[in-house]
Amino acid sequence: MTTMTDTLTPQDQSTGLVSKFKTYAPHAIAGVASLVFLDSLRFKFTNAPETQTIFGKLNEWAASFGAEGLFAQTGLFSQYVIGTAELVAATLLLVGILPAFRRLQAIGALIAFAVMSGAVNFHLWTPLGIDPNNDGGGLFFMAVVVWFTSAGLVFLRRKELAAIFAGLKTTLFPARS
């Protein structure tokens, strides 16, 4: 007795795998990024010592060029502001798993990419360094993982993002008659 897969050519089978990858990879990526973001919230929103160390070092660095308070608890880039952005990104990534809300996943991926671009750059180019909490660089590694996964998700959801930006353009700059 032959099965359906016996009658498929290798090309048909690989096309099926590509289709499954395109369908399920964005959900897996969204899940990974969301888990990292949601796990970090317990540190940011409870003012954990690890968070105090990180944002304290960043605030000292900012003060060295006249931007004291930038990373303080009431600053523009405080742990609460960053944590809220991560919460919004995680929510959009997870809600975007539902087919009717795919565009939200694309927006969540952009927010995640932006937040993690900042995190990775601050780890690399400020006195914060890649191991501010003596955790072997685990925090930095997770930031890099989320940065890459969110970049991948932005790529996979590029059509949705193009539609969003086209709609914004039409709304903000209506055609003149």
At which residue positions do the language-model features occur?
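Membrane-interface extramembranous regions
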Residues: 2-177
